[in-house]
């Protein structure tokens, strides 16, 4: 790499560092200044103020991540014009950041680098969390920057991510947690199909479950790792939080449906809170949510993402019997992950 190119890279990185300092500070100012904000109004406003290159979808995902953490309800009300000014500055800075990231991307890709670089993303997350003075918690900062990075990648290449479907399952949620909302997601029917899509080049990366803290290993994924030449690029640990999803209030629910595994993980809660409800196994959690949407008195046990995707109300969160229910998902692809070198690297052996 020539000296001129190295200088250009460093200039872009320095600019991004300066922007990140400002953005993290502004996000913390924003979160304590507008406790009574209506989410839909805020999302519409930031989209209206967006002049690109970030998509409206990406900016709304960024603000949704911020607001999911909870704006301070005790915050002293300030002039709406001040809040609007904060939002405008945040949006403009994020768009400037993406432009600099795009310049870096062009140089790196011209030299054969991948669009998705988990090691580099980990460094970014560590950096922005180190800049965070609070009150926003670091997980929220990571969620925000997950979407910033996702939007940046999408402007360079709309990566295709395949996952074990159907849509709005926990595997889908794990994929979005890792890659952000701005990429192209495609559900498959089987774990074998996930591997096949990536091997054929129809997808850039795949997401499959590998083990659950209560149910144990997912042997089909392990078998495919033995058979396939694909590599493990990254991993995602997802706490499994089941929600009771229904258009009917809790007292009117007569039937609860979901996959047998999900129902089994919520047996005690259902017995205590809906002792007279009929419990019915179904083919998938996503299908159960669709039924709950269309049928009065029916609830589904599924993820919050399912409720969001299908537009159904969440009547209760965290209905699982154990709070330590975690599933580990693998990100698979054709290229090997670069080691972080910070003691957190993992090597997996399949025998």
Range-by-range predicted roles:
Residues 1-351:
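Domain-level signature for soluble enzymes in the chorismate/prephenate branch of the shikimate pathway
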């Amino acid at each position: 790499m020539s000296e001129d190119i190295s200088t250009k890279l460093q200039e872009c990185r320095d600019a991004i560092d300066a922007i990140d300092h400002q953005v993290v500070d502004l996000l913390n100012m924003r979160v304590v200044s507008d406790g009574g904000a209506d989410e839909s109004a805020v999302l519409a406003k930031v989209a209206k103020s967006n002049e690109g290159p970030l998509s409206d979808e990406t900016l709304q995902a960024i603000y949704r991540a911020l607001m999911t953490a909870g704006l301070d309800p005790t915050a002293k009300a300030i002039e709406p014009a001040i809040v609007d000014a904060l939002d405008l500055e945040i949006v403009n800075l994020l768009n400037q950041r993406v432009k600099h990231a795009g310049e870096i991307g062009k140089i790196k890709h011209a030299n054969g680098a991948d669009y998705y670089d988990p090691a580099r993303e980990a460094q970014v997350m560590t950096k922005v969390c180190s800049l965070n003075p609070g009150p926003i918690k670091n997980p929220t900062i990571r969620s925000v920057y997950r979407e910033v990075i996702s939007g940046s990648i999408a402007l360079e290449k709309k990566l295709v991510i395949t996952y074990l479907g159907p849509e709005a399952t926990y595997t889908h949620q794990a994929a979005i947690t890792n890659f952000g909302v701005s990429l192209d997601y495609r559900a498959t029917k089987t774990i074998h199909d996930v591997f096949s899509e990536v091997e054929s080049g129809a997808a850039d990366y795949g997401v499959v479950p590998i083990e659950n803290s209560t149910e144990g290993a997912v042997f089909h994924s392990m078998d495919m790792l033995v058979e396939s030449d694909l590599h493990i690029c990254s991993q995602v640990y997802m706490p499994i939080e089941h929600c009771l999803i229904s258009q009917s209030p809790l007292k009117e629910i007569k039937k609860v449906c979901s996959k047998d595994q999900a129902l089994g993980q919520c047996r005690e809660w259902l017995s205590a809170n809906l002792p007279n409800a009929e419990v019915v196994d179904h083919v998938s959690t996503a299908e159960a949510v669709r039924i709950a949407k269309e049928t009065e008195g029916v609830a589904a046990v599924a993820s919050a993402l399912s409720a969001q995707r299908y537009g159904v109300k969440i009547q209760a969160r965290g209905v699982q019997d154990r709070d330590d229910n975690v599933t580990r998902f693998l990100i698979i692809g054709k290229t090997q992950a670069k080691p972080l070198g910070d003691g957190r690297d993992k090597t997996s052996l399949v025998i």
